[in-house]
């Protein structure tokens, strides 16, 4: 593995003719927004570009241009293509890209912002001080004088905004706001993006009401937990955004924990914090992320996983 500079990244992209873009499994707004924007940018530079995700693109992100160009692994297994570069966006570990890595032997490049990055790629461009990979892509386009179209601006604004809580989280910096402003200048409409992403159906609201009943507090109300059981996960799938923020906003709470029952003996966890390093907590269980936002999977039933987390915190 070698960490590369912005100039080395630019040179590698200039030399590549055929590029495959991918992101992590269970893709979020930053992953999808960054990928489709980078896709459009690279096509604009005359490159042959493909997109693959070893998962389903969440419905709420399909309003973005070029999401219909994203294929699953099975598509490329039956329609193989030759590539010069596998570009991994917003993924901090090799395991997070699923089966994608096994399909090609091309050099792996990684553009990421997670402090927990395992440096799995052949070439890594890491910016842990950036709030989102979308912020990195916007910054690259600016520094390389690549035009940001309206559709790119929309995708990149969504990428940035969703990874910093629409600019409410502590990872929001002056540069974050500057890059978001460039997206708006390109034609992104923050109100439309926010309304599209945050729209709530009546059925989801009914489920939220039920989930609220699972909220519990620990350690003098400084830790709060909220739970999604197997039934709720069947209904929601990976669309669990927002649940952890319900408890994060409680004034006494420093650590908010969302526990999602994936199986009888497997619990997926999302951690948010106002002060404690939750990346360290997640790393204890084999996960990672950021200082104030991280995640992990614990091979225990939900209630046991909850107790294990509270003991570590």
What does each model-identified segment do?
Residues 37-39, 103-106, 126-127, 178:
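Glycine-rich, phosphate-binding/catalytic loops in enzymes
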